[in-house]
């Protein structure tokens, strides 16, 4: 296990290679990961964003990072944590994670939104509002996985999306769902 004093020495050394290694360590002290979330090097920040041990405060700093790669790594990590969060009993930390996921699902870059969509597509514990928002995205890379796999979309949601979606291929993604009701099937055909 990494001691706090050892992590502090790495931070004080200002050696990028050592900081990258520290940012990737699951046993790094939370304070060190928080400090590294503000590093000038986007690679260091990306490693913190991908680190499951990073404290929620570091994740919140990184949600608005100037680097799309950093936000993408954060989106991937947060979305992968979602299946582990029970739908009923949510703690304050879990609520903050959901807030991060909501923000990343609204990212200006389709690539970041697509990462969120791919990671949560079949997850039943994601808030339904996030799945519905991604399902209505104009980019197929974003809405496609949700339309095809999300268990959170109702028949009414799917029929409305077929009627109003501007994303080419939305109806085809819905048609590829494992189970499609007659009313949804009729909407796809017409």
Question: Model-predicted segments: where are they?
Answer:
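Alpha-helical scaffold segments
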Residues: 1-190
């Amino acid at each position: 296990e990494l001691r706090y004093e050892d992590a502090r020495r790495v931070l004080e050394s200002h050696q990028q290679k050592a900081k990258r290694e520290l940012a990737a360590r699951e046993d790094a002290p939370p304070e060190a990961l928080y400090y590294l979330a503000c590093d000038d090097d986007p690679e260091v920040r990306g490693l913190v964003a991908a680190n499951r041990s990073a404290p929620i405060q570091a994740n919140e700093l990184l949600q608005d990072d100037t680097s799309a790669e950093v936000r993408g790594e954060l989106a991937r990590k947060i979305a992968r944590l979602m299946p582990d969060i029970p739908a009923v009993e949510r703690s304050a930390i879990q609520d903050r994670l959901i807030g991060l996921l909501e923000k990343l699902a609204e990212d200006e870059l389709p690539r970041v939104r697509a990462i969120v969509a791919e990671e949560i597509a079949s997850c039943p514990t994601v808030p339904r509002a996030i799945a519905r928002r991604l399902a209505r995205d104009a980019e197929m890379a974003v809405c496609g996985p949700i339309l095809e796999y999300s268990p959170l979309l109702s028949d009414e949601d799917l029929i409305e999306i077929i009627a109003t979606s501007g994303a080419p291929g939305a109806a085809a993604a819905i048609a590829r769902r494992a189970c499609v009701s007659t009313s949804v099937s009729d909407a796809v055909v017409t």
